[in-house]
Curated annotation (Swiss-Prot):
One of its GO terms (molecular function) is asparaginyl-tRNA synthase (glutamine-hydrolyzing) activity. Transmembrane segments: none annotated. It catalyses: L-glutamyl-tRNA(Gln) + L-glutamine + ATP + H2O = L-glutaminyl-tRNA(Gln) + L-glutamate + ADP + phosphate + H(+); L-aspartyl-tRNA(Asn) + L-glutamine + ATP + H2O = L-asparaginyl-tRNA(Asn) + L-glutamate + ADP + phosphate + 2 H(+). InterPro entries: Asp/Glu-ADT_sf_sub_c (IPR036113), GatC (IPR003837). This is Aspartyl/glutamyl-tRNA(Asn/Gln) amidotransferase subunit C. It comes from Prochlorococcus marinus (strain MIT 9215). PANTHER family: GLUTAMYL-TRNA(GLN) AMIDOTRANSFERASE SUBUNIT C, MITOCHONDRIAL. Belongs to the GatC family. It is an enzyme of class 6 (ligase). Keywords: ATP-binding, Ligase, Nucleotide-binding, Protein biosynthesis.
Length: 97
């Protein structure tokens, strides 16, 4: 891997529409070089016996059966709203027909 130079930082900044002063260019070049050094270290790690994965931890979906439950405090909840009509909250219209 090649080293990051100031011209490459300027080019990336231009593509990203960033205006960087000389101090920022130098700082970003140094930071990017440190990142690339870290990547170079990672490239040296032997991963031949490591199984491929997309996550660090296993993701398990937990499914449950949907069950209808009666709720006996509907009236109490409707009283908390600013406006209601029958057994529904009444809200301002936001879309035209």
């Amino acid at each position: 891997m090649s080293r990051i130079n100031k011209e490459e930082v300027k080019k990336v900044a231009q593509l990203a529409r960033l205006e960087l002063n000389i101090n920022e260019i130098n700082n970003h070049a140094e930071q990017l070089e440190k990142i690339l050094d870290y990547i170079r270290q990672l490239e040296k790690i032997d991963t031949d016996n490591v199984p491929c994965t997309t996550r660090a931890i296993e993701v398990i979906n937990v499914f449950r059966k949907d069950e209808k439950k009666n709720y006996d405090r509907t009236e109490e909840l409707l009283e908390l709203g600013p406006s209601r009509e029958d057994k529904y909250f009444k809200v301002p219209k936001i879309m035209n027909e």
